[in-house]
UniProtKB/Swiss-Prot annotation:
Pathway: Glycan biosynthesis; alginate biosynthesis
Residue numbers spanned by region Disordered: 372-395, 408-428
Keyword Coiled coil: no
SUPFAM superfamilies recorded: beta-Roll, Pectin lyase-like
UniProt keyword annotation of Cell inner membrane present: no
Pfam families given in the database record: Beta_helix (PF13229), HemolysinCabind (PF00353), Pect-lyase_RHGA_epim (PF12708)
Protein name: Mannuronan C5-epimerase AlgE1
Organism (species): Azotobacter vinelandii
GO process annotations (BP): alginic acid biosynthetic process
Stored SMART domains: CASH, PbH1
Molecular functions (GO terms): calcium ion binding; isomerase activity
Cysteines joined through disulfide linkages: none
Places the protein is found: Secreted
Length: 1403
């Protein structure tokens, strides 16, 4: 029941104190057994009670407070309040409150107008007492301007949820979780709070934080910690997703906590560490993006350290142990010291696997723990591996989860605490698991055995049947039994103190498997602790990497985008939810799907969660879809799966076209071409339960097959068979031989696969007999036999004939094969006038447009006649409409969306060739036409197309925008056109687009076609999926040659050519609306030349590859990347562009989309490799990356030359150049980032504040004027200063250069041009060597000023006071001045800085 507070006297006028009225409504709801207290929009002022714990409003069991929305309904503290308030809204102190909460409103603490500590929300039971608040829900709540905490669920609460809520501008933490059990924070935002964004403290456990965001807070973004009292630490905490950025301290701090997982989050821009693990145990940090932290000083991106609480409340020293870091991408800021740093304070047992680390200043990883490890490979699931030798070893574990491998010898293994795996290997081993759930693994029968005369069995000393397990899955035993036939006998000794698992089957050496366990385990073994089959390798709800072994096993990925590899053995792979990558490996593997959502796709939203099988072997492997209800292969409808080969021919998709309520349908991809190789043998389909179909198969003999009430497929094969489908909608295929076919009840299909399945000769009959054909629901499928329809039995037709008695109907061909066999089937009964294309399926026919009245004389309007032929083909179930050579004039039919000619399912237009068959718009047409030839608006059309003809828009003699070809389903609706093929078609003289497949089309192919002299683009691909443009030409179109836009993905362009177009040759772009970007595009081969703008323009798109193309002679840039991500430009020839102005050959820049999305799209992660790039005389650069946020560009092994300003300019802090050749450019005066290669490079920064990085090789770095950062990289590098004003300071400011990695043993600083004579006191032409007070930076300083007050100074990172000498600093009088002008011929690469002025002249 709802209780409106205004009915209780609340005013919500922002002035009156409404506390009493709202509380009265709460009390009334509680008295009635519960209800909703509703606060309409308004500002409700409230005041506190006598004690802080009285709060303002006390909520009670079964009561929920609901407003009209955040910012609409506001509960605000009265002005001038002076007493602390522990929760403006709170549960009652000392009472257990349950099933209560708050939603859709704002709490405002009004902290600027009061003088007390006020918290927003508070609930929880008395600390240390037996009791708890339960089932608390807060949704869509904003808490702001508190002088205390925002959300403060405090002490002993079970099952609290806070979601979709916001805390900001509060004096302490935004969100607190204090002693919360089984709760969740989901999709919340915490910003601009004076302390932490989220603070998880004091015994909180079994708690989940999912997709929360914290930024701009005065403390950390997220803290999980014990707190200031000696209480149990937080544990079993999962932090999944979300972002923690721009906070003053850490992004995430885990302090005195254990068993915490942080995964799938982005953590960046924080003042100190990105992640700090501080006296915590068993922390997992998985698959996060951690970057650009350490904004307020020099810190590691991830720090692992112990916490000294010996002088604190516990008196303990908390060592950080068992930290697991895997799959993280870590990139440092300019201040970041290490990617991952372990302090030398006892921190140990850190395990680092497959992390990507770059951009840090000191080193990627620094580990001090004796047992800490780092690997580039993925982890195995255990936190460490202890391995013995071939001798007698004693291995002892720790509190971590470890794998102990004894190898050969009589070993003693002790796992200690943790969930350990113990594998003694060969020899007689003594195995002690210790505390935790341990697994005793046996990898070979000879690891533990006895003979008739001696025992060599292993002894397990402390097996716990409740939590330990014995893994025998590699040994081939089937279970417990009598010790024979692959079983094991369980036997105890006479005293009952020892248990044996024994096999009595000996090998050739008389060895029979046996293990011993201390204790009596009779009746205690079960499937959970005695594993005969391999235990499943299980993932998590995150993105996991599971790798099998040589044994047969089951891999369960669960949620996330998992990678499963079965290895050898006959494995079962179950990816679970998410987009998974599945590799069976060697053996006969089964890929199993347990839910439709395990592998699904939504063509409306573009969400692709389809799994990929990478190594399917149709001779061994199988795909199990039995749990999904699929009954067989088919057309993708009604419980079948369609087999669809993609346009490139390198991927086979299994697709259902039946969507769920959210628009998702099942889809699965197999790498490779499996057309013709897939049948029911490769699948496990649904059983016959619940109306689903199964297969009943005969032999080569005379079979009787009987169906059931289910939908079944009966295959008679050879022989004289009798098939009866029974009930259900069945498919009956008798195969060869004279068969009798009875469908039974239901809508049955009688399928004939070859003409010899049912035939007669001149002397005998071998025809099949259908005994119970029902023309109203049954069908005869002859689609594969080549018959076009009913007729006289000749010319590919069948004669319908009834016997004289009227008791039998025949379908007969009189055309015999070489053996005199002519097709014939018989039906019991007289079906005269009852058989047609609705119940007999023929092969699509050819419909000549001239038979319908078309003239093709270039004058008559042939539209009605051609449309009649199309309609006839459609009515016949599909066919080809043939237009002989001629010019067919057509007119519009009505609305723009009606076009001229409307194609339908299964219908293809075909002519006699380009220029021979011409469909041309009539003179004088003044109507807009969205497709002269098109599919129907609002209908899903499939299996249609056009070939061997020309469409002519006649634009000189018409008005109105006219497009050539158009197809596609309604944008944003659930549906799509499918399987569209256009071949050898010319489209010309349109006032609009040429080819315009527009919105939601799956599997379209346009090949060997031409578009020219059209008013807009030649070819458009708008929301195309799994489609291809191949061997097409677009020229002289007024806009772009090819335009790929709006959500198009999984798209291939092969060997297309675009020239002479008024825009770009090829554009791939999002378009003008805020829609999904095109993605997963491959452009392979072809040429793009002599276009007015770019040769190729990529704009607001991602995951595009451009390779093996030639791009030249275009008006602006050859290739322009404009707000893109993850683009590859590989092995192209790009030359002689920039014909209409001054542009780079290849330009990378950000796109300002403030007018549509409000976003700035930076160009990121571009790879340019193996290209020949030769700038024209007009080009200012061969390759230029704008200084606009574009970054992470990688140039590898290119041949680059030319450029008026420079050959290469890279402005991104993480961009790099290596390999190949780059012509020597001219220097300029901007703020540059110059990166050398592995060769011996010369880097000249010019003026500006530059960043120079020599990379590998013996490099020369000259920053020039400006305050420069100089990194030599590996090799013997020389830092050259050509003028005293290149690096200096004044009394007012510092403009010195900084050398970041000076190595006194091989690098040199060349000051020979400056006139200094050596080291000294900084006067009389000497330089003083001075160390900073922190001991972290060394300066070379002169105290002698020039006329402008500038005195030379250079800074070096680190303490070099003891290693600078004449051997590594070159002064004017030491005879080594020649170093500054080393022979350029010996230098393989020179990179010169660039101007900050944009000279590209691009719109």
């Amino acid at each position: 029941m709802d209780y409106n507070v205004k009915d209780f006297g609340a005013l919500g006028d922002g002035v009156s104190d409404d506390t009493a009225a709202i509380q009265a409504a709460i009390d009334a709801a509680h008295a009635a057994g519960g209800g909703t207290v509703y606060l309409p929009a308004g500002e409700y002022r409230v005041s506190g009670g006598e004690e802080p714990s009285d709060g303002c409003l006390t909520i009670k069991s079964n009561v929920h407070i609901v407003g009209a929305g955040m910012g609409e309904t506001v509960i605000k503290m009265v002005d001038g309040w002076t007493q602390n308030v522990t929760g403006m809204v709170r549960s009652a102190y000392g009472e257990e409150t349950s099933n209560f909460g708050m939603s859709d409103l704002t709490l405002d603490g009004n902290r600027d107008n009061l003088s007390a500590k006020v918290d927003g929300w508070f609930n929880g039971y008395i600390p240390g007492q037996d009791g708890a608040d339960r089932d608390v829900t807060l949704e869509r709540v904003e808490i702001r301007e508190m002088s205390g905490y925002g959300f403060d669920p405090h002490e002993q609460t079970i099952n609290l949820t806070i979601r979709d809520s916001v805390a900001h501008d509060n004096s302490l933490d935004g969100f607190v979780a204090d002693y919360q059990v089984g709760g969740v924070f989901e999709n919340n935002v915490s910003y601009n709070n004076d302390r932490h964004g989220f603070n998880i403290v004091t015994s909180t456990n079994d708690f989940v934080l999912s997709n929360n965001v914290a930024y701009g807070n005065g403390g950390a973004g997220l803290v999980v910690q014990r707190g200031s009292y000696d209480l149990p630490h937080p544990y079993d905490i999962l932090i999944d997703g979300g972002a923690y950025y721009d906070n003053a301290l850490e992004g995430v701090q885990l302090k005195m906590a254990h068993d915490v997982t942080l995964q799938n989050a982005e953590i960046y821009g924080n003042g100190l560490y990105g992640v700090r693990v501080y006296g915590a145990q068993d922390v997992q940090i998985l698959d996060n993006q951690i970057h650009d932290n350490s904004q307020n000083g020099a810190y590691a991106e991830v720090l692992l350290q112990s916490y000294d609480d010996t002088a604190g409340v516990s008196g303990n020293f908390y060592v950080t142990t068992g930290t697991w870091l895997e799959g993280n991408v870590i990139s440092g800021s300019a201040n970041s010291t290490y990617g991952i740093q372990e302090r030398a304070d006892g921190t140990d047992y850190s395990s680092l696997y497959a992390n990507s680390i770059d951009g840090v200043q000191t080193g990627a990883v620094r580990l001090y723990g004796a047992n800490s490890t780092v690997s580039s490979q993925s982890g195995s699931g255990q936190q460490a591996t202890l391995e013995g030798s071939a001798g007698n070893d004693a291995l002892s574990g720790t509190e971590a989860h470890e794998t102990l491998l004894g190898q050969a010898g009589d070993d003693r293994l002790n796992g200690d605490a943790g969930n350990d795996i113990l594998d003694g290997g060969a020899g007689r081993d003594n195995l002690t698991g210790g505390a935790g759930a341990d697994t005793f693994r046996f990898s070979a029968r000879t690891d533990s055995y006895r003979t008739d005369s001696a025992s060599f069995n292993d002894l397990i000393t402390d097996f716990d049947a409740d939590e330990d397990s014995i893994d025998l899955s590699a040994l081939g035993f089937t279970g417990l039994g009598d010790g024979y036939n692959g079983t094991l006998l369980l036997k105890t000794n006479a005293e009952g103190t020892r248990t044996y698992l024994k096999s009595y089957e000996a090998d050739a050496q008389g060895r029979r498997f046996e293990i011993a366990l201390d204790g009596n385990f009779t009746g205690l073994f079960n499937d959970n602790n005695l594993l005969f089959d391999a235990a499943p390798a299980t993932g998590t709800e995150g993105s996991d990497n599971l790798l099998g072994t040589d044994a047969g096993e089951t891999l369960l990925g669960y949620g996330g985008n998992d990678t499963l590899n079965g290895g050898a053995g006959d494995d079962i792979l179950v990816g679970g939810a998410g987009r998974d990558s599945l590799t069976g490996g060697a053996g006969a593997d089964v890929f199993r799907f347990d839910a439709l959502s395990d592998s699904q796709r939504n063509y409306t939203t573009g969400d692709n969660q389809a799994d990929r099988i990478l190594d399917f072997d149709p001779t061994l492997d199988r795909i199990d879809v039995s749990a999904l209800g699929f009954t067989g292969l088919g057309n993708g409808r009604n419980g079948t799966l369609a087999v669809v080969l993609n346009s490139a021919g390198d991927r086979t998709d299994l697709k259902s076209y039946d969507t769920d309520a959210n628009g998702y349908s099942f889809e699965l991809s197999l790498a490779g071409n499996y057309q013709g190789q897939l049948s029911a043998e490769q699948f496990v389909f649904a059983t016959s339960q619940g109306g689903q179909m199964t297969i009943i198969e005969g032999t080569d003999g005379n079979d009787t097959l009987q169906g059931t009430e289910a939908n079944e497929r009966l295959l008679g094969l050879d022989g004289r068979d009798n098939l009866n489908g029974g009930a259900g909608d069945d498919i009956l295929d008798g195969g060869a031989g004279r068969d009798t076919l009875t469908g039974g009840t239901g809508a049955d299909t009688f399928l004939f696969s070859t003409r010899t399945d049912s035939y007669r000769t001149d002397s005998a009959s071998f025809n099949d007999l259908i005994t119970d054909f029902d023309p109203t629901q049954d069908r005869i499928d002859l689609s594969g036999l080549g018959f076009s329809g009913f007729g006289n039995g000749y010319d590919g037709t069948l004669l319908l004939q009834v016997n004289a008695a009227g008791t039998r109907t025949y379908l007969k061909s009189f055309e015999a094969d070489a053996n005199g066999q002519r097709f014939e089937i018989a039906l019991d009964g007289d079906f005269s006038g009852q058989l047609d294309s609705g119940n007999v399926i023929f092969e699509p026919a050819v419909f000549n447009a001239k038979d319908f009245g078309a003239l093709g004389d270039g004058a008559s309007d042939d539209r009605p006649a051609i449309q009649a032929a199309i309609d006839a083909a459609y009515a016949a179930g599909g066919g080809t409409v043939y237009l002989p050579a001629g010019e067919y004039r057509v007119s519009p039919t009505g609305e723009p969306g009606d076009g001229c000619l409307m194609l339908k399912d299964g219908v293809y237009l075909a002519g006699d060739g380009i220029g021979e068959t011409v469909i041309k718009l009539i003179d004088g047409s003044d109507q807009k036409i969205t497709g002269m030839v098109r599919s129907a608006y609002g209908e899903e059309t499939s299996n249609f197309g056009m070939s061997d003809l020309t469409l002519d828009g006649n634009r000189d003699n018409t008005s109105g925008k006219v497009d050539g070809w158009f197809n596609g389903y309604i944008p944003g609706q659930d549906g799509a056109d499918r399987n569209v093929t256009i071949e050898r078609v010319e489209i010309r003289e349109m006032s609009g687009y040429g080819f315009d497949p527009h919105e939601q089309t799956i599997n379209l192919t346009i090949r060997d076609s031409v578009a020219h002299d059209n008013g807009l683009d030649g070819f458009v691909a708008d929301y195309l999926v799994d489609s291809v443009f191949e061997n097409n030409v677009a020229y002289n179109n007024d806009r772009h040659g090819f335009n790929i836009v709006t959500s198009t993905y999984d798209f291939v362009m092969t060997n297309n050519v675009a020239y002479g177009n008024g825009g770009a040759g090829l554009t791939i772009q999002r378009g003008s609306e805020d829609l999904a970007q095109p993605t997963d595009i491959l452009i392979d081969g072809g040429a793009y030349y002599d276009n007015a703008l770019e040769g190729v323009l990529f704009k607001m798109t991602n995951n595009v590859t451009l390779q093996n193309a030639e791009i030249y002679g275009n008006g602006s840039s050859g290739v322009r990347l404009y707000g893109t991500e993850d683009v590859q430009i590989l092995d192209n020839q790009i030359h002689d562009n920039s014909q209409n102005g001054t542009y780079p050959e290849v330009l990378l820049q950000a796109f300002d989309d403030s007018q549509v999305t409000g976003e700035l799209y930076e160009t990121l992660n571009t790879r340019i490799e193996g290209n020949l790039i030769d700038a024209s005389d007009n080009a200012n650069y061969a390759v230029r990356e704008r200084d606009d946020g574009s970054d992470y560009t990688t140039l590898v092994d290119n041949d680059i030359s030319g450029g008026q300003v420079a050959s290469v300019q890279l402005s991104g802090a993480h961009s790099s150049l290596s390999g190949g050749t780059v012509e020597v450019p001219q220097g300029t005066d901007g703020n540059d980032v110059l990166v050398g290669s592995d060769a011996n490079d010369q880097l000249y920064g010019g003026a500006g504040d530059d960043r120079l990085d020599g990379g590998a090789g013996d490099d020369l770095l000259d920053g020039g004027a400006g305050r420069d950062d100089l990194t030599g990289g590996t090799g013997a590098d020389t830092f050259v200063f050509a003028a005293r004003t290149d690096s200096y300071r004044t009394d007012a400011g510092v403009f010195n250069d900084l050398i970041l990695d000076f190595d006194a043993s091989e690098d040199r600083i060349d000051l020979s041009a400056l006139g200094f004579s050596g080291f000294g006191d900084g006067y009389n032409g000497t330089l003083l060597v001075q160390l900073s007070s922190a001991g972290t930076r060394t300066y070379l300083k002169s105290y002698e000023e020039d006329l402008e007050g500038r005195r030379f100074e250079v800074a070096l990172d680190g303490d070099h006071t003891g290693d600078l000498s004449a051997a590594n600093v070159v002064f004017a009088d030491d005879g080594s001045a020649a170093v500054a002008s080393s022979d350029p011929a010996a230098t393989q690469l020179e990179v010169v800085g660039s101007s900050g002025t944009q000279t590209d002249q691009l719109a």
